[in-house]
Amino acid sequence: YVKFDQTATYVMPENPDSAGDDAQRMEGLARIGYLRDYGKALISPVVGNAKSNNALTIDLGQQTTISYDLGTMRTIGTWTGGFLDFSGTLHHRLRAGGLPNARFEKIVRSDGWQWAWDGKAENETPDIFPKTVWPEDQLRYNGHYPHGEDTIISYSVQGRGVLESPKLQKMGKAVVIHHRMTINPGRNQLELIVLDDKPVIKGNSATIGFSKVWLQSEEPGLKFRSSENGKLVLQIPPSDNLIHFNVAFAHDESESIKNKQPSNQIANLAGKIKGGPRRWLTAHTTKGRLATSTFQGYVMDSITVPLKNAYNSWMRTSSLAFFPDGRLAVGTLPGDVWIVSGINNNLSQVTWQRFAAGLYEPLGMKVVDGVLTAITRGRIVKLHDYNNDGEADFYEAFFNEDEPDKGWHAYNFDLEVGKDGSFYYGRTGGFSQWSVPGGVVKVSADGKKSTVIGAGLRVPNGIGKLPDGRITLGDNQGTYVPASKISITRPDAFHGAGSWTCLL
């Protein structure tokens, strides 16, 4: 991203054509994804030359980007020339219906990386529509770890844990993408589809046209094969120990990498998941304002938000939660979480420290057993700070939805915790692809089960909890029901918006 001087405006005007040179510069940076520091990894939908309802998009540096669909862990593409085009999105405009766009130059065959169903590449992947997330006995996204310039993705495939970290290398005129892998022990064989299109395999390398793949491994039994349906497949054998290997991929029509070998990138990724170095070293100090009137039903102090900050973050505050020690966590619509300290009886020195970035619209947070927990689009995320340095080290996918929605207006609202430890949040039905017409979702305390306890909600932009544990909600705008009503929901309730008459 590019830093602006102190005179810059950080909110894009609605009419950029007449907004001056500064706004035009911001528009250009938004179109290539470098207006703001989003962290090295961002969760969002992706459209354009790569498509996903819920993707993890990783900045590899040198204007090179890779993106994974989190429902299948399939790569939807690697591209050069930018990160994502945010110009028509809520990352850049006050109100916008656009989605992050991968409109850049996609590397040929960079979207073939996918795990085989039931461990065999010849197996046909079943149609799971309307779901877009594989069942968890096949694959589960567990979260990701930022570690310096690296992003380490954690997931499980047919019961075996996997750590994967992509890395960029320039070789000749080509871009080489390394997939560094650590696989947990397990008694079942896994198969990873690396490329399509009938490969020519020679030992630990394979070619398809101008595309080349190298396997770097010291593990016996780990090898390439060509499947019956013409795919380049990596066989991963059963093992009693961790398996470390690297798969490097390049596409080069200039043949500048002919007879060259990429650098060895085998790494023990398990050694990088207990906390990395701090990334955001600049804290911001503001001064709050105490309430002055004594003739009010309540007192309202004001905490000043650092609208101008070292990361060009757009501080569209969207959620908050207090820690037991009085610190405040503040989420923003573009995906940041900041920790705010100095909230006391004078507010003379309020300090803002960036804690996390790249979340998908955190619109509700709670501190549960000391861990900051957020509802985002597609999942409930727990943010773990393992080394107590003030930054999240693991973005744990505590609960994954099986129908994440890409609609720009299909929000998940608020987070409440029940007496039994279960979680509740409101999910939009209007402007949504969800097969339920909006509802309150209940997630078990262990994150393994979810149920809808009330449906027929257009945009439930607020939920609450009564002393007896019942859940209240506020819907908006009507849609043939009273606008801005407050309801008490219950299992099997239907609140009138949408097309259902009952919850089956």
Which functions belong to the PLM regions below?
Residues 1-176, 189-198, 202-211:
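Beta-strand-rich N-terminal accessory domains
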Residues 18, 68, 242-244, 460:
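Aromatic-residue-lined binding/catalytic grooves and analogous aromatic/hydrophobic interfacial grooves
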Residues 185-187, 194-196, 228, 248-251:
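Long, charge-rich, low-complexity alpha-helical segments
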Residues 1-49, 251-301:
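N-terminal pre-domain segments of enzymes
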Residues 177-185:
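Short, well-ordered beta-strand segments enriched in hydrophobic/aromatic residues
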